[in-house]
Amino acid sequence: MARSDDADSRAARWEKEAHDLSTQVAFLQEELALVRRKLTESPRQVRQLEERLAAAQAQLARLTENNERLVSTLKEARAQIVTLKEEIDRLAQPPSGYGVFLARHDDGTVDVFTGGRKLRVAVSPSLEVADLRRGQEVLLNDALNIVDAFGYERAGEVVMLKEVLAGPDGAPGDRALVVSHSDEERVVHLAETLIDAPIRAGDSLMIEPRSAYAYERIPKSEVEELVLEEVPDVDYTDIGGLHAQIEQIRDAVELPFLHADLFREHQLRPPKGILLYGPPGCGKTLIAKAVANSLAKKIAERRGEEKHTSYFLNIKGPELLNKYVGETERHIRLVFQRAREKAGEGTPVIVFFDEMDSVFRTRGSGVSSDVENTIVPQLLSEIDGVEGLENVIVIGASNREDMIDPAILRPGRLDVKIKIERPDAEAAKDIFSKYILPGLPLHPDDLAEHDSDPQATVAAMIDAVVLRMYSETEENRFLEVTYANGDKDVLYFKDFNSGAMIQNIVDRGKKMAIKEFLTSARKGMRLQHLLDACVDEFRENEDLPNTTNPDDWARISGKKGERIVYIRTLVSGGKGADAGRSIETASNTGQYL
């Protein structure tokens, strides 16, 4: 019985253990199936995880880029905010004023001129008071303290310096007396830029009227507006047909300058001035320029100098006149003051008044004004003042010397009077030789007629064209003049010839040669070109000026003597003009001959 119970219990235990083992086997089988299934699904999951990882990395890169862009935008926005804040702060600041520095004081304060007031203000610690200069522009804050310094004023009013006022010790000071365009005088301070500058009376200065400071010397002085100051390069050899006149002017000008000791020994006073008179275009201005050049060369040779210097002050006569009373006289004084300064340097100075009759007319001859009543005496006093000066001579030129005030022409002022005549045939040849040179392109046909000798060809061309100009033939008849006594006279084109007309004829001939070369490819100037140019020049001058006073016109043209009361032209076939027209009825006007 006991064994049976024990067997039953063992059987039950074994059965239970078998059941447990069966359960475990079933569980393990399920686990094994699950493991097998997982092993089967594992590669697919790996691929999915890899895909998710790649997507996450791409999203991370995008987020990183966006983050960097946002950071950059944030930095830019922060910088813009700072800039805008600075701009707002700057716009919110009170306005700063400008002033002019006047003087410094021992206590560190300075005087400035601003807003029409003179103030004593402090200077910012960032600036050195010792570095501030009189007349300098400074910046003032809202408390009117200097916070910055700049340069000098660059714009203002132009005035004429009359004189630099002396300081307490008698030396040139820091103030000047100036004259405005309205002839108003005022005293101004000189900025430090002008304290040591070489300024003189007559210079133009730029001032700032409110602060009364002069800042800058304008390079062109007032007197330079009236004269042409130059070193002439014209020589006597450049002038043709005036040998006698050149000899006269050499005796009058060069001898006193080059042999001053002989003049003093003989107690001979050198001439103060020369008057060159004659018809227009005959070389008066050219001679005056040659005088200055020749005189400078001679003086340089005597001194043993290689470089020669001379000054030719060519006065623009009509520009001397000014509507304000006394201005014309002041201009004349400035001209002679400049001449004295240049002469003081030891160089010859020629003061040349061209068209002298336009300014220095006979006193009392004015129709509507009496301006010459004060201008002429001013010139007379200046010419008399030249007596004690060295290297200065006055030369006047005019084609109406009868209209110049007699006090100017009397001995002791314009001592030497030289008439510049119209060129005769020989003088015309000499003038032509200055413009027609063997080196010019000459036509082969003309050269062939003279054995290809350029010199002979040029000489023959000049002889032929002068013969054409000066022959008293029917085609050269120009005018018939009637004098007050009833006499009549026939004038030819040669009677109105001049050096300027000869130059114009040569220029016309050269132009014709150029035009022929461009059309026919045959190069060189021919005699026919000059003859045609001569005809064209005469034809252009056949219409006289439309004046009702033929006697005045004749005087300007150089025909003086018996008074002319009537003029009629004798030219036919030119420009459609009818022969026999009187000057009073001429419809077309031309130039003075």
From Swiss-Prot:
Cellular component, GO annotation: proteasome complex
Family note: Belongs to the AAA ATPase family.
Coiled-coil ranges from the UniProt annotation: 5-94
Subunit and partners: Homohexamer. Assembles into a hexameric ring structure that caps the 20S proteasome core. Strongly interacts with the prokaryotic ubiquitin-like protein Pup through a hydrophobic interface; the interacting region of ARC lies in its N-terminal coiled-coil domain. There is one Pup binding site per ARC hexamer ring. Upon ATP-binding, the C-terminus of ARC interacts with the alpha-rings of the proteasome core, possibly by binding to the intersubunit pockets.
Domain commentary: Consists of three main regions, an N-terminal coiled-coil domain that binds to protein Pup and functions as a docking station, an interdomain involved in ARC hexamerization, and a C-terminal ATPase domain of the AAA type.
Sites where the protein binds ATP: G281, C282, G283, K284, T285, L286
UniProt feature, compositional bias: Polar residues: 584-593
Protein name: Proteasome-associated ATPase
Keywords: ATP-binding, Chaperone, Coiled coil, Nucleotide-binding, Proteasome
Region (Disordered): 574-593
Protein role: ATPase which is responsible for recognizing, binding, unfolding and translocation of pupylated proteins into the bacterial 20S proteasome core particle. May be essential for opening the gate of the 20S proteasome via an interaction with its C-terminus, thereby allowing substrate entry and access to the site of proteolysis. Thus, the C-termini of the proteasomal ATPase may function like a 'key in a lock' to induce gate opening and therefore regulate proteolysis.
GO BP annotations listed: modification-dependent protein catabolic process; proteasomal protein catabolic process
UniProt GO molecular function: ATP binding; ATP hydrolysis activity
Annotated region (Docks into pockets in the proteasome alpha-ring), positions in chain: 592-593
Organism domain of life: Bacteria
Pathway the protein acts in: Protein degradation; proteasomal Pup-dependent pathway
